[in-house]
């Protein structure tokens, strides 16, 4: 199961019979969260894996953390790593110190430390739509 923050990226993802793509449009609503939690319970021990792909920014980090906390505790980031960040850095947007301080102050799960470090080292963020180029 792959949750995708941005509609353009969701629409461009290729179909794979063994994968369910879910457009998250940012944060899931309470009803959407309940549906996804029920789906997780129905799948039980069938070996389903959970991934989320998002903007490489503060919002993307927060959405991932929300999914991990409220829906899929074992969710993994997809294309939210150092390699992806530097591949698309040319499309990045410079951020001011106030924004970077919010990122700095956020306790992220281990799987997003690399992304947090990239944002803080470069001072920029990348919208997921940039990855369509």
Model regions and ranges:
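Catalytic core segments in nucleotide and nucleic-acid processing enzymes
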Residues: 1-133
């Amino acid at each position: 199961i792959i949750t995708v923050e941005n509609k353009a990226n969701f629409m461009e993802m290729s179909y794979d019979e063994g994968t369910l793509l879910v457009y998250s449009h940012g944060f899931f609503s309470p009803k959407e969260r309940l549906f996804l939690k029920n789906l997780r319970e129905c799948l039980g021990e069938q070996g389903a894996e959970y991934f989320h792909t998002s903007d490489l920014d503060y919002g993307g980090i927060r959405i991932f953390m929300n999914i991990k906390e409220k829906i899929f505790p074992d969710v993994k980031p997809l294309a939210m790593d150092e390699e992806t960040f530097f591949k698309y850095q040319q499309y990045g947007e410079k951020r001011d110190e106030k924004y970077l301080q919010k990122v700095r102050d956020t306790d992220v799960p281990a799987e997003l430390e690399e992304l947090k470090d990239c944002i803080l080292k470069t001072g920029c963020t990348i919208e997921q739509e940039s990855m369509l180029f």
